[in-house]
Amino acid sequence: MEMPQPNLEVLRKKLEIVTALLEVLPREAVIDNPAETKAYECDALTAYRCPPMIAVLPSTTQQVSDVLKICYHHEVPVVPRGSGTSLAGGALPTADSVILGVAKMNKVLETDYENRVIKVQSGRTNLSVSGAVEEENFFYAPDPSSQLACAIAGNIAMNSGGAHCLKYGVTTNNLLGVKMVMMDGEIVEIGGSYLDSSGLDILGVICGSEGQLGVVTEATLRILPKPEGARPVMIAFNSNEVAGTCVADIIKAGVLPVAIEFMDRPIIEICEKFAKAGYPECEALLIVEVEGSETEIRDQMDRI
């Protein structure tokens, strides 16, 4: 992939831009040394790399607004960055750009168990949202494979899901509202703390937009009570087609598993070689997980 040519006029103004950024951010939050900006040259898609001109790490919504106003004034491209775990290259900068990382914005701002809502800064990691409410037996449902490290900002940008999206949906199904900063620095709030907020469904546009419409700084998320228990079952098949038909039959039987994972023979062999899990000799596997009370689990297992 050929990277776009940088704007030489912007590069010539680097010192002026850094000076302006230092008026609104502490020194440690402005990274302009080429040896240090190299850390932001890519996300988890490491095949493509390009160090940014500058990286900034604001810690408040107002600081994000101030940064974007400066960049807007100087016509500097801005690339928002969560935790850099994406494999899609969404946080790949250009040589004349400013990377705006939200990693320092990781606080829990409000928790409302009665209404099953939590408000967090967007740099908070996915798994730590559940960690913040687990003592009250709640959890945050979307669970991408990188949930230990990925940021809520990135989850919103990519509309991330995970193994349990079959029952609980992806980020857009669990996002109630955001505070975000438009590219000219204007701060806006969209949605709210309730499932049905008034107005147009702008959240549906924001979620999955890969940061192109603005920088999300706060997110209001739905939290759910933890189920009493969960149990997986592994089913072997002699063909991929039969496994696929079984998925439809499970749903038709009135069972909504919390997760269904499909593995074909090549994947089974690779996983067995690595994990030595004792997978059976077969053409396809389904790993189906159900949850609920012990009675509910047994009933679902019987129907499966």
Question: Can you describe what each PLM-predicted range is?
Answer:
Residues 1-304:
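Noncatalytic alpha-helical scaffold of FAD-dependent oxidoreductases
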